[in-house]
Amino acid sequence: MAKRVTGPEIEKLIQLLAKVPGLGPRSARRAALHLIKKREQLMGPLALAMGEAHAKVKICSCCGNVDTIDPCTVCTDERRDQSMIIVVEDVSDLWALERAGAMNVAYHVLGGTLSPLDGVGPDDLNIKGLIDRVAKGGVREIIIAVNATVEGQTTAHYITDHLAGLGVKTTRLAHGVPVGGELDYLDEGTLSAALRARTLI
């Protein structure tokens, strides 16, 4: 059994940090030590910011985004084309698409993908909210931007089937060769998807 070398408060900090995605036990220890060394400049402001976020952050009742207002900043932005909705798995995907800056449209966060093996069904996701948004009218296109996994494909098909008959165009992201990618380094699935999604030049 390993000897304890720190007090319970530091151990608790390490254990909580280890629960953050991307941080394992070793990275959590490093992060904790860094925070402790920078108590005044970093730990105090971080604790304050986390407290404020805990008190103020809400889940948008319209799209599922996280913000301090409900409806969120994206849903209330009149400069966005609200007739187009990009459907994503998680808020991190919404943020990634916003960083790309390709389109100024609305979003809908599902909160995951259908996965019967993991016990995740349609009622566990924000799919009904999407169907309700479309049924209200004013939406002309749904862009499904879920990951190219089995669960993502299943979710995309489920959504497409349930939007049929609502008079909305349903598209999905093209999958294929990344910008700057070399064909020799791509897997067969990516190459096949790129060939199917080919475009005129």
Swiss-Prot record:
Q: Which domain of life is it from?
A: Bacteria
Q: Is the keyword NADP assigned to this protein?
A: no
Tell me, what is one Gene Ontology molecular-function annotation carried by this entry? zinc ion binding
GO biological process entries: DNA recombination; DNA repair
- Key words, A-Z: DNA damage, DNA recombination, DNA repair, Metal-binding, Zinc, Zinc-finger
Which family is annotated? Belongs to the RecR family.
Task: Give the protein's recorded name.
Answer: Recombination protein RecR
Q: Which gene encodes it?
A: recR
